[in-house]
C-alpha cells in the first residue's frame, strides 16, 4: 500500500474524504487543505480519474527531520529516483512550507533539484533536464517547522483542468471548487438546478457531469502515466469501466441564465464542445426578472465580488433588489450564493440558514444558504 496526499480547496476536506472513500482509499485523515490516504496504484488511478474536488494527488516518497538545507539535500539524494522515472523525463521541483525557519525556499528547491540530479548521475551516468512550465515529472517538497516530506505528483496539470471548458469570461471558478459547492448544496441529479449568473458555465458543466455519472478526468492525461511503474493495461481497464458507466446525454432539468450575452454564448459553446449541447437550457435573462419553472429546487450562484473600483457601490444597490426578487419569485427554493462580499445577507435582507467559510485560492469567501420559505426570511 502506498501513502498519498490529496490537495483540495480549504473548506472542502470533508467532501473530498467522502469521494476518496468511494474510490477505495483507506486510512483517511483530513487536514487543512487536503486529505491523507492509503491505497494501491489502482486506487491512485481511480482517484485522479474520478475525484471532482481534488486539486492534485501526491505520492508520499519519504519524510525526515531537518535543521538546515543540507539535511534536506541528504534526505533527497538517498531516494531511488531512477527507479521512479526515466532520465529522459523533464523535472520540476516545487516547495511549500508552513512555519519553516529556513530563509529561502528557492534555495531548498535548488538543493532538492541538485539531489535528484546527483542521484541520477550516480546511478545512470546522466541527469534529467529541468522544465519549470510543463514538466513530465514534479517532485513536491513540503516543509513544516522541523520535518521535510518529499512527494511525486501523480496528477500533472491540476485536476480542476477537466479539458472541457474552453471559452471563459473574467475569472471563472475553478472546476473542483464549483463541484465542491454543488456537493455542499445537497443537490441531487434529477432535482431542478438553476444558476442565474452562469458566467462561462462552470457550475452547469460540473452538474451535468455529476448527473450523467461522467468521471471528470476522462478528457485528459495524468503524470502517473509517465512514472516507471505505470501499469498501462490496468489503467485502460479502469478508464474503460468509467466510460461504460456514463449515462446518455439527454435533456436535464438544469438551467443557466446570465444578463450578459457574451457569457451566454461562452456557456453554450462550452456545453456544445463538451458534448452536452441540448442537455442544459441556457438563456439570456436578468436574475431580477427570472422566475423558476418548478415549485422547488436548488439555485446556486457566484455573484461579483466587487473588487474593482465602483463595483462595491453597484453591488450595494443591486443586493436589495436581489432580495426582493427572491422573496417575490423563489419561495420553496434553496438558494446558495458563493461570494467574498460578506455584506450580502445584510444587504439582501434575508437571513442565511447556513454560512460556510470557503477559500477561492487565497481569498476567503462564504457560501450562504438562504431557504426561501414564503414570508419567513424577512429581517425585522
Regions found by a protein language model. Give the residues of each.
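Flexible, glycine-/basic-rich loop-and-beta segments that form/coincide
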Residues: 46, 51, 157-162, 166-167, ...
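SAM-dependent Rossmann-like transferase core, predominantly class I methyltransferases
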Residues: 150-184
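Non-catalytic nucleic-acid substrate-recognition regions in nucleic-acid-modifying enzymes
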Residues: 1-137, 380
Amino acid at each position: 500500500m502506498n501513502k498519498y496526499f490529496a490537495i483540495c480547496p480549504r473548506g472542502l476536506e470533508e467532501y473530498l474524504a467522502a469521494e476518496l472513500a468511494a474510490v477505495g482509499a483507506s486510512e483517511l485523515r483530513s487536514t487543512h487543505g487536503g486529505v491523507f490516504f492509503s491505497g494501491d496504484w489502482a486506487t491512485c488511478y481511480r482517484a485522479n480519474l474520478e475525484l471532482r474536488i481534488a486539486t492534485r494527488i501526491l505520492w508520499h516518497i519519504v519524510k525526515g527531520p531537518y535543521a538546515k538545507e543540507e539535511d534536506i539535500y541528504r534526505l533527497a539524494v538517498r531516494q531511488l529516483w531512477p527507479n521512479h522515472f526515466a532520465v529522459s523525463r523533464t523535472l520540476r521541483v516545487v516547495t511549500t512550507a508552513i512555519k519553516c525557519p529556513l530563509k529561502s525556499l528557492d534555495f531548498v528547491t535548488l538543493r532538492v533539484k541538485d539531489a535528484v540530479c546527483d542521484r541520477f548521475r550516480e546511478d545512470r551516468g546522466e541527469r534529467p533536464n529541468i522544465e519549470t512550465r510543463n514538466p513530465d515529472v514534479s517532485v513536491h517538497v513540503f516543509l513544516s517547522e522541523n520535518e521535510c516530506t518529499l512527494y511525486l505528483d501523480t496528477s500533472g496539470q491540476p485536476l480542476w483542468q477537466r479539458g472541457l471548458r474552453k471559452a471563459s469570461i473574467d475569472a471563472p471558478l475553478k472546476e473542483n471548487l464549483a463541484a465542491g459547492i454543488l456537493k455542499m448544496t445537497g443537490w441531487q441529479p434529477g432535482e431542478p438546478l438553476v444558476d442565474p449568473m452562469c458566467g462561462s458555465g462552470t457550475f452547469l458543466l460540473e452538474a451535468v457531469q455529476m448527473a450523467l455519472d461522467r468521471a471528470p478526468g476522462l478528457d485528459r492525461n495524468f503524470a502517473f502515466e509517465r512514472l516507471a511503474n505505470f501499469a498501462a493495461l490496468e489503467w485502460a481497464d479502469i478508464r474503460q469501466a468509467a466510460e461504460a458507466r456514463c449515462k446518455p446525454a439527454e435533456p436535464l432539468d438544469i438551467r443557466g441564465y446570465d444578463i450578459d450575452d457574451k457569457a451566454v454564448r461562452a456557456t453554450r459553446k462550452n456545453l456544445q464542445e463538451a458534448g452536452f449541447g441540448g442537455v442544459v437550457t441556457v438563456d439570456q435573462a436578468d436574475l431580477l426578472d427570472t422566475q423558476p419553472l418548478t415549485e422547488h429546487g436548488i439555485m446556486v450562484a457566484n455573484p461579483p465580488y466587487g473588487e474593482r473600483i465602483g463595483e462595491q457601490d453597484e453591488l450595494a444597490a443591486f443586493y436589495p433588489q436581489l432580495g426582493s426578487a427572491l422573496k417575490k419569485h423563489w419561495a420553496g427554493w434553496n438558494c446558495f450564493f458563493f461570494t467574498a462580499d460578506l455584506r450580502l445577507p445584510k444587504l439582501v435582507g434575508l437571513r442565511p440558514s447556513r454560512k460556510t467559510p470557503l477559500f477561492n485560492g487565497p481569498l476567503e469567501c462564504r457560501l450562504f444558504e438562504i431557504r426561501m420559505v414564503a414570508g419567513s426570511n424577512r429581517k425585522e
